[in-house]
Amino acid sequence: MSLDINQIALHQLIKRDEQNLELVLRDSLLEPTTTVVEMVAELHRVYSAKNKAYGLFNEESELAQALRLQRQGEEDFLAFSRAATGRLRDELAKYPFADGGIVLFCHYRYLAVEYLLVTVLNNLSSMRVNENLDINPTHYLDINHADIVARIDLTEWETNPQSTRYLTFLKGRVGRKVADFFMDFLGASEGLNAKAQNRGLLQAVDDFTAEAQLDKAERQNVRQQVYSYCNEQLQAGEEIELESLSKELSGVSEVSFSEFTAEKGYELEESFPADRSTLRQLTKYAGSGGGLTINFDAMLLGERIFWDPATDTLTIKGTPPNLHDQLQRRTSGGK
């Protein structure tokens, strides 16, 4: 992985009681040792694989102002990180669920793009077996389950300040909402809505195939083409390029897909991030609620699965063998 650390700082917030978060600040930056580089590379990998929300700094953002001064050389990175951790502590202290953790600021470069990663990591206890096969206690940073994370694309921020997507963040778990304190700390608001872009794409694809008067099999083939392209982009860490997708769909209609979306006013960006959960709807129908979970391939609708919108009834012809066996055992009294 072509990742180079410019500067990295580590601090800690310790919850002493329900009212107080103690601030523990390092007096020096971390050295970019092999272990540190491997840790940041793992953070980068884990974060890049997750669905993210996009945002931008508010005009009054204290973090943005401090970061701008640091980038201009008026403040060093350590001082910037120490002051920012203090502001984070002040925001966290407003919420009863604040647990503290290891606060990390890392300025790094990956594939010619500069980033600032800010995260709060849990330092967890576990066990390990040593070379003598004895079991000893150990501690580790819970990188895989980090949910308080934000990353600023410094290159995008400085070259295109009008962008609505240079800042990305994770929304967090229920009951631990990033928007409640981390966005206040960042002084940021949501920008590009990736889910809305993906939903708009799905609607445009359906309308495009309908206008082209394709039959059911042809429509499903187009949806599969779109899914394959988008999934490849997602796996490669690339965005959906509308023009590239349009070329993939050449031949479907006399009008190109990109021309169709522009003429019909779908307001799709030229490129936008793929959203995994939304894109699944191209090839599958899925839903859950009231103790019921249903998931099936889109091609089965109208063949083995039928929906009556008047009665909101779903009829399934031919159940999966394992489900059939369970139902048969239950209805026969377990015999």
UniProtKB/Swiss-Prot annotation:
Compartment(s) of residence: Cytoplasm, Nucleoid
Any one cellular-component term (Gene Ontology): cytoplasm
Coiled-coil features, chain-numbered ranges: none
Organism superkingdom: Bacteria
Major subcellular site: cytoplasm
Alphabetized GO MF terms: double-stranded DNA binding; single-stranded RNA binding
InterPro entries associated with the record: Nucleoid_associated_NdpA
Keywords assigned: Cytoplasm
Assigned protein family: Belongs to the YejK family.
PANTHER family: NUCLEOID-ASSOCIATED PROTEIN YEJK, PTHR38772
HAMAP family xref list: NdpA
Name of the protein described by the UniProt record: Nucleoid-associated protein YejK
Organism, as annotated: Salmonella paratyphi C (strain RKS4594)
